[in-house]
Amino acid sequence: MNKIIVIGSSNTDMVVRSERLPRAGESVIGGNFMMAGGGKGANQAVAVARMGHRVLFVAAVGNDIFGNAAIEGYKNFGIDTSHIIRKDEPSGVALIMVDGAGQNSISVALGANNSLTPEDIMPALEQIAEGDIVLLQLEIPMATVDACVEIASAKGAKVILNPAPAAIVSDTTLSKLYLITPNQTEAQTLTGIEVTDTNTAELAAQKLVSQGVERVVITMGSQGAYLYQDGKGVMIPAHKVEAVDTTAAGDVYNGALCAALAEGTPLTEALHFAAKASAISVTRAGAQPSIPTRAEVDNF
């Protein structure tokens, strides 16, 4: 079975739930408070591990209590933490507000994540073999993302970029990807096309393909996900559930997708698997605490 390497952010999530999100300049009395592991990279690595796969996680944390707790938590999930770098900066922290409908607003202090350099990730990249899967996001410096994509793709790895948070990515990097997985907002940032339905998703996907991407999956919340490859598009429906917290839905989707692909599952079938994992996660509070087990996904 091919290896899965996740390179990305490690945060501590501080979550406050309230009936609605505050407007600018407004204070809202919240309800429950929760603190747990987070960060897009970490969430995706945990999702891979929860699907029953070994995963190597490459990240940067501070020499502080948050960094200590994060590494211990990853080890408890069975994640290989041997390439997590310690930095003389605070560990990343995310402040998350969740409303009564499960929608969220997030502000991230990147801290040590912002100092993960191309040099830091080189020892991990030396382990990559042809057919391995490398999963990246954009909560680390773009120079590090670009270097990873160049080296991993040259080694024959399947490089998957979840371009979150939304940012412009160079055509050079896009052309080396096996797959890109933006949500609607991220797809608009990358293409300038507002994605609201299947037709606009196809236009955005075609624009990305024209920039060199081979395959595009645009996640569209409750509408599902739009897959475009080989000049054809198809909608992968989402499962209807009652959402409690959507914080890590995209991360669970990407992690489960990589797990399925590592098993040799065809892309369309892997996306159906990812949709099930993501659907389960939004019915639970928190990021990493919401991630289902492999058995739960198989039985969904």
Regions found by a protein language model. Give the residues of each.
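Glycine-rich phosphate/adenosyl-contacting loop at the front of the ribokinase-like
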Residues: M1-A60, I65-K75, A243-V244
